[in-house]
């Protein structure tokens, strides 16, 4: 059987004030066409359907139409929540509504009998078992362990062991006469960041070993890291990568999806399929005349411009006049005004930095080296950005 593995759509993403909904529409059309051209039996969306936990009506409509189009022609579709998604929204609205139409949505981890392990059959009568593990926040991990594993909080396991225990429960029903798939939105040890992930939820507290996946699985379909890659594991385990570069840190990534071929008793094979529709992101560095020349040859790519020029009034406006697709203009390190200098505070250096990075800068300035403070801030930020239900 053939499986389409995609993840990290981030529909609703706004890049430096530029709406990208038209790009996402084109990207999802490309993914739908891949499903048709490859005549796949199953589509897996391994989390982060949306960019934010409060997606706009237009973003929601786009995702819903895409999922229904992927379901056409008797394909199975399984989608799980990522750390950017609102798990409650997916469970309370998308799951019952799209479930009636044959699309399987999981916002939070479920027991095997409640939809955490799906037993499906392809058009050709082949058996297919899917163990689905949505993103699990530190905060919700305790609650999930209580509900799914009947673990008491006072005997709490650490995060990685909780995730491993839940995956073990979900994959316990794998059988040798079925194609066994596990899908998860998680950070695996050894995985390479793509450049646009939410740092607080790729930190070491969230890393889990690839040994959580059993050798009885034919394939592990992963989401969260935006760079397509294989992770050494007891079974073939891949991140599909994002089909759209979501930030300038991902400009070198090639947008794509994976087509997986699997059968009982054999090792699954995965191959990349390019996804079209997204605009390229490029960083241009150099003197003003150099970056303008390069930018004029960059087509419709969105640009980040880093100038080797002395600060002067109107420089950024001049670049944007010549290069309308320049979304960010800053000076290089050698020419950037320093804090307390005549040029004022070092505002450009803050561009694109995450809250966790900015808080780390503040702690360094205050000579605070207590890791507990950073961990508490990470947990606080996690609660603010997490769409899981409160415990």
Across the structure, where does each feature detected by a protein language model lie?
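N-terminal active-site segment of His-dependent metallophosphoesterases
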Residues: 1-68, 72, 379-383, 387-391
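Metal-dependent catalytic neighborhoods of phosphoester/phosphodiester hydrolases
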Residues: 14-17, 49-66, 81-101, 106-107, ...
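Accessory, non-catalytic peripheral segments of nucleic-acid enzymes
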Residues: 37, 42, 262-391
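Active-site neighborhood of divalent metal-dependent phosphoester/pyrophosphate hydrolases
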Residues: 10, 40-58, 74-89, 188-204
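Binuclear metal-dependent phosphoesterase catalytic core
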Residues: 116-129, 133, 235-299
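Conserved beta-sheet core of the metallophosphoesterase superfamily
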Residues: 99-100, 188-266
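Conserved catalytic scaffold of divalent metal-dependent phosphoesterases
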Residues: 96-203, 263, 274
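Active-site neighborhood of phospho(di)ester-bond hydrolases with catalytic His/Asp-centered motifs
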Residues: 6-7, 43-48, 76-83, 104-109, ...
